[in-house]
Swiss-Prot record:
PANTHER family: FATTY ACID/PHOSPHOLIPID SYNTHESIS PROTEIN PLSX (PTHR30100), PHOSPHATE ACYLTRANSFERASE (PTHR30100:SF1). Its main location: cytoplasm. Catalyzes the reversible formation of acyl-phosphate (acyl-PO(4)) from acyl-[acyl-carrier-protein] (acyl-ACP). This enzyme utilizes acyl-ACP as fatty acyl donor, but not acyl-CoA. It is found in: Cytoplasm. The lineage of its organism: Bacteria, Pseudomonadati, Campylobacterota, Epsilonproteobacteria, Campylobacterales. This is Phosphate acyltransferase. It catalyses: a fatty acyl-[ACP] + phosphate = an acyl phosphate + holo-[ACP]. It is an enzyme of class 2 (transferase). Keywords: Cytoplasm, Lipid biosynthesis, Lipid metabolism, Phospholipid biosynthesis, Phospholipid metabolism, Transferase. Transmembrane segments: none annotated. Pfam families: FA_synthesis. Its EC number is 2.3.1.274.
Length: 329
């Protein structure tokens, strides 16, 4: 049975949505959750029926969102530190946290270690697309200052991930740039372009719009660019839906039309862009599975993050990454 260490104290809303998400996940899938945090508080929120279905590891400290990620290594009694240690010590297969993302990534990288041939891990996320499948973008925040070699490794990891997780054969990998021509880009992307040509699925430079139009399956960028893209996209989605609501309220025919489209159109659209459907972002390149969830995650997001951790662990994606990069040496 897959064992998942879950930081029960991380997140903006405390342990309640996390425990609720664990309960929802247990109702649908078989796995062993290990809740790390204040045992008394966890037990007070856990329904009686599920008490014997979880393990609890006591942690007396919580790393707040305002704390420095660099201090995470010193906070050995924190819930996220102890959760990561369970994976390091092979007592769990995966770790999940909606807490301090910087601390989670730091601890996962330094305590769990990196896969062979990986110099830096990358945070990966799936973006909605007009194509048959969603588009994987990496890095979206783990490494702000990248080398060309980092970007090459990101491309290889992304290729392996979508093959194993999304079952896409011969995935197309693009390098995010300011134009699709081979000559476009800055010093970093131009050097990375040469390295990425060694990947069988590399199709060249892509523009921001190509993330969403189905042109490629994987988009590679540095964490600084990727994080800006991710947050800008979230803002666009929020704005578009709010504008739609405003215009619908101003017109009776629009209200009637919206009512007719509510279930089959709007509900499906919302599902495509709802971050809670994705649950969290895997930190690719670490020796194990680490899922970083949004601080504002609700129970649905936590449930889906757990499902993502289960799928990641079962897929053997890390072995695929190692194999792919060892072939290129």
């Amino acid at each position: 049975m897959i064992r998942i260490a879950i930081d029960a104290m991380g997140g903006d809303f405390g342990p309640e949505p996390i425990i609720e998400g664990v309960v929802q996940a247990l109702e649908e899938k078989t796995f062993q959750p290990i809740l790390v945090g204040d045992k008394e508080e966890i037990l007070s929120l856990l329904p009686q029926y599920y008490i014997d279905k979880v393990e609890i590891v006591e942690a007396t400290d919580v790393i707040d969102m305002s704390d420095q990620a660099t201090n995470a290594l010193k906070r050995k009694d924190s819930s996220i530190y102890k959760a990561v240690e369970l994976v390091r010590n092979k007592e769990a297969d995966a770790v999940l946290s909606a807490g301090h993302s910087g601390a989670t990534m730091t601890l996962a990288t330094l305590r769990m270690g990196r896969l062979p041939h990986i110099s830096k891990p990358a945070l990966a996320t799936l973006m909605p697309s007009l194509g048959k499948n969603k588009t994987l973008v990496l890095d979206v925040g783990a490494v702000t200052d990248c080398t060309p070699q980092n970007l090459y490794e990101f491309g290889a990891m992304g290729e392996a991930y979508v093959e194993k997780i999304l079952n896409i054969r011969n995935p197309r990998v693009g390098l995010l740039s300011n134009g699709s021509e081979d000559s476009k880009g800055n010093a970093l992307t131009k050097e990375a372009f040469v390295l990425l040509k060694n990947l069988r699925g590399f199709v060249g430079n892509v523009e921001g719009k190509d993330i969403f139009n189905g042109k490629v399956d994987v988009v590679v960028c540095d964490g600084f660019t990727g994080n800006i893209m991710l947050k800008a996209s979230e803002g666009v989605v929020t704005t578009v839906f709010e504008l739609m609501k405003q215009y619908i309220r101003k017109s009776l025919p629009a209200k009637i039309g919206a009512l007719m489209m509510r279930k089959k159109v709007f509900a499906n659209m919302k599902r495509q862009v709802d971050k809670d459907e994705y649950g969290g972002a895997p930190l690719l390149g670490v020796d194990g599975c680490a899922i970083v969830s949004h601080g504002a995650s609700n129970a649905k997001a936590i449930k889906n993050a757990i499902f993502q951790a289960i799928l990641f662990t079962e897929s053997g994606v890390n072995s695929q990454i190692e194999e792919l990069l060892s072939e290129k040496e």
